[in-house]
């Protein structure tokens, strides 16, 4: 990769990170505890490739990083919600994510579910607010694409197939379906 592309990617990662750090800072109960659980997973690190790709796609389509930043952050929120739910005992029952205890290990299953739900709803709210500020329908279209890929024919379909295939002998077509929907379907 060219040095200027690496610099752009790192600058975009830092931009997204700063934006995410400004989310969910309410200090009253009950939101404070919920926001703490949401931030725990959202700010647990990661490469932020999905939001970086979102910013670059927007630029390629004539938009700016500033216009796309709420959508990029929303993509990361949706991704994080899916990881929180995937780690739950009823799903993959993972104890660690990115080298740290998973949300349900730190906050309990109930708050982990609510944190995931909260992130998904916050993503939709964030995109809705941003779309309302745009003079054309690009924001609504972006929101529709993101939520469709996160929904019942996208990531949720992959997770459902993963759950239903528990105990089956892995087949190439099954693994490909799960990966293309559960892992790769989110823009």
Predicted feature descriptions by range:
Residues 14-15, 21-187:
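Mg2+-dependent prenyl diphosphate-binding active-site environment of isoprenoid biosynthetic enzymes
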Residues 1-18:
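N-terminal leader/targeting segments and the immediately adjacent pre-domain N-terminus
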